[in-house]
Amino acid sequence: MGTSPSSSTALASCSRIARRATATMIAGSLLLLGFLSTTTAQPEQKASNLIGTYRHVDRATGQVLTCDKCPAGTYVSEHCTNTSLRVCSSCPVGTFTRHENGIEKCHDCSQPCPWPMIEKLPCAALTDRECTCPPGMFQSNATCAPHTVCPVGWGVRKKGTETEDVRCKQCARGTFSDVPSSVMKCKAYTDCLSQNLVVIKPGTKETDNVCGTLPSFSSSTSPSPGTAIFPRPEHMETHEVPSSTYVPKGMNSTESNSSASVRPKVLSSIQEGTVPDNTSSARGKEDVNKTLPNLQVVNHQQGPHHRHILKLLPSMEATGGEKSSTPIKGPKRGHPRQNLHKHFDINEHLPWMIVLFLLLVLVVIVVCSIRKSSRTLKKGPRQDPSAIVEKAGLKKSMTPTQNREKWIYYCNGHGIDILKLVAAQVGSQWKDIYQFLCNASEREVAAFSNGYTADHERAYAALQHWTIRGPEASLAQLISALRQHRRNDVVEKIRGLMEDTTQLETDKLALPMSPSPLSPSPIPSPNAKLENSALLTVEPSPQDKNKGFFVDESEPLLRCDSTSSGSSALSRNGSFITKEKKDTVLRQVRLDPCDLQPIFDDMLHFLNPEELRVIEEIPQAEDKLDRLFEIIGVKSQEASQTLLDSVYSHLPDLL
């Protein structure tokens, strides 16, 4: 029997699903295996990196042995031999070691903390004693001083710490401080409106707002018939709401009558108290307890208060002998609302106005810099390097001759152009080096590629353009770019050129010539071999001979990989470590202080007891390192190399 088309389609789809599931499972298993292998390899790598070693001279055999360092908190009580491992012992009381080491004695802890300082860290096997000031005090001139107390009206702007004093500031508008304190900030005024209260007395920088209750009339029992709310006219006059339209003497009678026409009616209806006497005569004799609040009224409005009294009294008469369950609220009286639209004070807004102005100036500078840079990048150097130098000389103080002579090293009466030397060696790598030096775009690289025929011409033009684009171009940056692209052979050629006794062969420094105006015109020389090379036979002036070549960090960078040779002019003082290299290390250490103890621990086996005593007497760690350079530098090249390796391993920023 034949199969139907629908069944064949279903079988095909099932097979595709099965294949996808199988592929997914295989990929998942491979990922799991890769993850497990990575996680198992990491502990092994960490374990191998945790173990440090040191070198020890066996006094019995005179051999230099490599021993494992002791962990932190211990010291080497017995060094290793050919048949035994080193023995570590715990640091005794009063001593410590922070790192793994190969020393024979732990470091002494610092002196006990002088009064009133307290111990922040105790003296232990792993840590030195650290002192600090107690709470409420800060360190000032090697002693502790109490934090400043902010007076009344002032609050804490910045809390004090162990090393800084308290900073106070005057309470701003809307805040106050009523107690002197060294920890409290200014507090905000009490919000009377949120508590259904009014401000009776506004706050100041030293006091809070004084709030009061709203005026209200409350009665425990309703007035009985025949009993007036105000039994005497004097009482009514005492508690009568005063009016802002008070009629002084000398006012005409019509105005006074019209202003008082309302109150006589109210008083007469109250004072007469002629209410029909029903069966509640006994209750009429009962006393009526009334509470009339004594308020401080600030502003009074005549119209609303009088209308309130007219509405209030008839309601009291109508509810004769019944108790009033609803309190009678009076008009809202309180402190007048402060005027929100006050005069503009320039002193209050001056700080943020200055900040906005500085931000505006910064934005303008950034925009102008970006536009100038974009115009420079768009132009693209399609002309020869000599024209580039001439155009750059119109805008900069440095002339083309000065810029060219900056990269020329004079040796035996001949001027050797460093840029030509590098251009002749890098070949097609000039693109990567040029992009690394000045972040050039593909368009600029293409301009050099299309403008010249040979790679050394393109490289020389690109390097000259790099030196013209910014005055910060230096030999140190060029060497860094060469090392970045693994051209240490070119760096060694430059290094050999700068050495006094090393002479480079002329044919190795020769740069192929072309009819293009690439090479600067050298001074004629009778030697035909020098005419076809990149050597410039320019006799330097006495000033040029005396001044250094590239006054920057170029020379330490050239010699950071090893100690200088014994024939170098920089090592003629008997030291295997050049002065420039030592000064570079010490300058970096003084700029960025760090823990130098591991370096001293690594070099202990090279020092005799007298040298160790001399170094221990020096108080500053940087001066100790300087003295260590002087001592180790004259011992041997192996000791000098060990010191440099230790410095570069513990201070990686120097690389």
From Swiss-Prot:
Q: Which residues are glycosylated?
A: N82, N141, N252, N257, N278, N289
Any signal peptide, and if so, which residues? 1-41
Q: Which Pfam families match?
A: Death (PF00531), TNFR_c6 (PF00020)
Task: Report biased composition (Polar residues) as residue ranges.
Answer: 243-261, 268-282
Induction (free text): Up-regulated by TNF.
Span list, region Disordered? 243-286, 318-337
Is Transport found in the keyword set?
no
Cytoplasmic compartment spans: 371-655
**Gene3D superfamilies on file:** Death Domain, Fas, Tumor Necrosis Factor Receptor, subunit A, domain 2
Record-annotated Death domain positions: 415-498
TNFR-Cys repeat residue intervals: 50-88, 90-131, 133-167, 170-211
Regions of this protein lying in the Extracellular compartment: 42-349
Which cystines does this chain contain? C67-C80, C70-C88, C91-C106, C109-C123, C113-C131, C133-C144, C150-C168, C171-C186, C192-C211
Q: In which tissues is it expressed?
A: Detected in fetal spinal cord and in brain neurons, with higher levels in brain from Alzheimer disease patients (at protein level). Highly expressed in heart, brain, placenta, pancreas, lymph node, thymus and prostate. Detected at lower levels in lung, skeletal muscle, kidney, testis, uterus, small intestine, colon, spleen, bone marrow and fetal liver. Very low levels were found in adult liver and peripheral blood leukocytes.
Kindly list the places in or outside the cell where this protein is found, as annotated in its UniProt entry: Cell membrane
Alphabetically sorted, this entry's keywords are:
Adaptive immunity, Apoptosis, Cell membrane, Disulfide bond, Glycoprotein, Host-virus interaction, Immunity, Lipoprotein, Membrane, Oxidation, Palmitate, Receptor, Repeat, Signal, Transmembrane, Transmembrane helix
Q: Which residues cross the membrane?
A: 350-370
Q: Which domain of life is it from?
A: Eukaryota
Task: Report the function annotation for this chain.
Answer: Promotes apoptosis, possibly via a pathway that involves the activation of NF-kappa-B. Can also promote apoptosis mediated by BAX and by the release of cytochrome c from the mitochondria into the cytoplasm. Trophic-factor deprivation triggers the cleavage of surface APP by beta-secretase to release sAPP-beta which is further cleaved to release an N-terminal fragment of APP (N-APP). Negatively regulates oligodendrocyte survival, maturation and myelination.
Subunit text: Associates with TRADD. Interacts with NGFR. Interacts with CASP8. (Microbial infection) Interacts with hepatitis C virus (HCV) non-structural protein 5A; this interaction allows the modulation by the virus of JNK, p38 MAPK, STAT3, and Akt signaling pathways in a DR6-dependent manner.
What name appears for this protein in its UniProt entry? Tumor necrosis factor receptor superfamily member 21
Q: Which organism is it from?
A: Homo sapiens
Its lineage opens with: Eukaryota, Metazoa, Chordata, Craniata, Vertebrata
